[in-house]
Amino acid sequence: MDQRPELLSSMEYVASPDPKPGVPLRVAENVAPGAEDWLPSASGHLAWATSLETEHQTHLELSEEQRLQISKELVDLQIATHHLREQHEAEVFELRREILRLESRVLELELHGNGACQGHKVQPMANLGQHQVPPLEPPGGQQKLQEELKWLLEHHRARQQALETQVGVLSQQLQGAREEARTTGQQLASQAMVLASCKGQLRQAEAENTQLQLQLKKMNEEYAVRLQHYARETVENASSTNQAALQAFLESTLQDIRAAHRTREQQLAQAARTYRKRLADLNQRQELLLTTCRATFATAINLEPLPMHWATELSHPRENEYGRHRTLLLYPEKGSGETSKENKSQPLALDTASWAQIQQRLQDFSQDTQAELERERAQLMVRATMAEQQLSELQEYVDQHLGRYKQEILKLRKLVNIGDPQGVEAVSSPGSGGARL
């Protein structure tokens, strides 16, 4: 019962794809130039997409835990089967040694009996009454040994049947574990289909978000035109007596712009923290995956060689055993030589062939597992590099906008301190940029 391919098939599902950490940034890149200033208004759609990704990522993590648990159960079943086989082989060896001891005892008694019979024939008939040799062996000694040998054979047959029953139960459990692994694979495939459909919905939501951002841009341009018009009217209607009211209006406008800038900074800082957290989570999951695969592979390597063709080994040796013992009972001298030759040649050839085949399978399994781990490590490294690039771009984006906001605030402060009513027209250009936020 070779279970190495099943171990390989159960490990093929260790790795699963994560939602790409660059989705929020891709939404910002699809917007027309200058549209990144309107991202706060689309936070609801972005939060919905993020929650959808988190939910499906949780399902994928659960399926990974199920696959690891099934792989562990398969390895435990294989170890239990191996221990049972070792116990069976030890009992068979003890029984064979006991049979050989009894065979040697029978041969020894037969030789003594034959020698005693020949000695009695040579002696004169006159000395039979004076000096009679006592029999060396009781009349029923050989029959008793044969009965004991038959009892040992029956006991061995019963033990072998019990071990076959245990092996059958373990085989059924292993088949159930394989069915469970197949069911888990089907569930994973269905979850992958659901994830693909959710990705389609996410792309549709991104398209809708882009359209909403374009509409927001048009509305901001319209409001900027209105603000410019209202500023001109205010300058035209302002007089020396209304200078204080104009300054109060400019102060309130400046406070609104500062509040918008502060909100924008908080949103960008939150996005940067989210990217850092996702990058750390990705690195942690990579380390956990590599550790789990390494532990499973080490457990598989530490297993001792198992005998091949177990079903054939359970059926044919029994018939050979009965034939050999029948030969021993009928021809004791012929049976002892054949028994010693079989015990020396057959296990040695079987162990050598089994060990060579298992060593080849372990080597193939190690090469395939190593190649798969290398591919997965390369993919994770690429994803980590992409996440770092996106994080650096986001940091640069935050620094650039903070610098621009500071320049706009300085310009507005200069205009308020000067108190020039004609400078209100210059407020329209930075004010429109603040309104877009």
Swiss-Prot record:
It is found in: Cytoplasm, Cytoskeleton, Microtubule organizing center, Centrosome, Centriole; Cytoplasm, Perinuclear region; Cell membrane, Sarcolemma; Sarcoplasmic reticulum. GO terms for cellular component: centriole; cytoplasm; deuterosome; perinuclear region of cytoplasm; sarcolemma; sarcoplasmic reticulum. Pfam families: DUF4472. The keyword Membrane applies. It comes from the Eukaryota. The keyword Ligase does not apply. Residues 83-114, 147-287, 360-408 form a coiled coil. One of its GO terms (biological process) is skeletal muscle contraction. Its main location: cytoplasm. Keywords: Cell membrane, Cilium biogenesis/degradation, Coiled coil, Cytoplasm, Cytoskeleton, Membrane, Sarcoplasmic reticulum. Component of the deuterosome, a structure that promotes de novo centriole amplification in multiciliated cells that can generate more than 100 centrioles. Deuterosome-mediated centriole amplification occurs in terminally differentiated multiciliated cells (G1/0) and not in S phase. Essential for centriole amplification and is required for CEP152 localization to the deuterosome. Belongs to the CCDC78 family. This is Coiled-coil domain-containing protein 78.
